Amino acid sequence: MSDITYQQARKLGLKEVKSRNGRGEDPYLPALEALLPGVNSLSEVDLGSIRIDIDQVAGTRNVGRREAFSASFYPLLEENSEFAAKWSRLAASHLKEGIRDPITAVEYLNRFYVVEGHKRVSVLRFFGAATVRAEVKRLLPPKSEDTEIRVYYEFLDFYKVTHISCIRLTHLGSYPLLLDLLCGEDRTVWDEDRQRSFLSGVYRFRKVYKDSPLGSALTQDGALVRYLQIFGPAALLSRTPGELKTDLAAIVPELNSIKNDSSPVLVTDPAEAPRGIISRLVHPGVKELRAAFLHDKDPETSFWTYAHEQGRVAAQASLEGRVETTGVFRMEDRDFDETIRELRDAGYNMVFTTTSRLLPATLTAAAAYQDVKFLNCSVNVSHPILRCYYPRMYEAKFLTGIIAGAMCDSDVVRYISDYPAYSTLASINAFALGVKTVSPRSRVLLHWSSVTDAKGPMERSGVAAVSGQDSLVRDARRRNLGLFLRLDGKLVHAASSSWRWSTFYRKIFESVLDGSWSDLNSTSEQGQSINYWWGLKAGVVDVQLGDCVPPGTAQLVQLLRRQIADGGFRPFDGPLYDQSGTLRIQTGQVLTPLQILEMDWLVDNVDGEIPSLDRLTPPARELVKIQDAMEDTPET
């Protein structure tokens, strides 16, 4: 009489075969040599004896054993067979003392195929084991541009440091993102203790996630990456299952964002239409507001911080005591969570962090303190539990380009930018198009101030106009900011594209006070992040003209300014070509705000290049990596 355990396992196997046949699917074990005819020619790397996730055991190496098992490794042979007897003895041994002998397998594209030990895998799968010990040889596919192959080689870099193979990600960039989250700049190879600690956190997270209502929303490893983005590795290792459940409940909008593959909602102008009576009843607004501004530096050493502080103070003064604000400086030297807790206990219910360097900490705080409104000064960020903001500077840059092209007495204009972040390339291109509008033969020489090995365009002679850093306040000429021209042998201030933080902060305060802030809450709850990207129309950016600008040029600039603000003129109307001569924007094509924001090319009258990450100074590299990490969407 056959063993009852084998009968139960075989019943599951026969049921799976019937179900798969009904769906027109192969019911038996996948065989790697059938899936990959050239498998014998692949290079091999001996990984030795490692513990692998049993869910990653995808099939068998050779076709000979595949019909003895269903696709999920349940046995299929008759109950009175020698195979069944061996399977039953192995099952009894497992229940008594566990299966100790490792299987032999090959790994291909982070899936494992059994060479020897099929029944051991079958028994372990039936009893719900999580892992199995295996002697593994890795089969390396040739490198190619195929997405799956490229992701796999990113996985190999991840594995080289962690020796963790159970994380399954399929999007380009996901493994480098995960490695950065876990290790930062430290690429020291993990020892067994660190591996065990991390895997313990992973399996605990998977169990909680699987048992939650979100368990079928997206892949568990995609959810894991987003969890690590928000709470960090320390939380994964230390949280109890109950605390993990609470954390997951706090980031439902974040997980919905992944599930829906949501891009940020770019709010390009403040709401101008009067709110309906239903909206006012549902979201009536507040009478008083307390807002804290957190800066990584202080106003004495940072012009950026100084400008935001001026905007904060002016915005508060304009609202006649309805808003109380405070500034907190040098957050780089403070405990972020402790600072937020103290502010919240003091009654502050709105927090602005004024640099993307504080974005990761702001994200963690937004998950922990859901009764506080958080905003970070960055853009194109896909995190719905906070809001982000940044000026639409390319509109003003186009206008300063008009001035440079009209007044420059040579065909060479220099443009100095800081580092390649979102919206930066749109500003460069808009300036170059402004130059080209009035001076078709002029070239714009691009220089990056944050590039360590900068050369090339800056060495060219004949430069008679320089567009430098934007003006954050009104004293542009005194601080040598904006556009300068060499006229009659002297360097003369011609124009500045300026940032009006006081206007932005006042309008955001007003939206909370009148309740219109909450009109966008349902968007966030559905998983879409709110990014304010206001420009000329909102009064958040503007252009200041120097005394040297001729009346005719000034009139042209003011005319175009009004038309851009009203939507009657678009700087990026086609046809537009990039530096290689490729048509990027066709005649009549209207770019969406997101397409403008995510420009990753330069127009054809720009001389220079977009620097790679490794050429940037460490501070600039840090900021770019933070913005990339915060915009990345893990696996759906």
Regions found by a protein language model. Give the residues of each.
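Extracytoplasmic "Venus flytrap"
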Residues: 290-310, 315, 326-333, 423-425
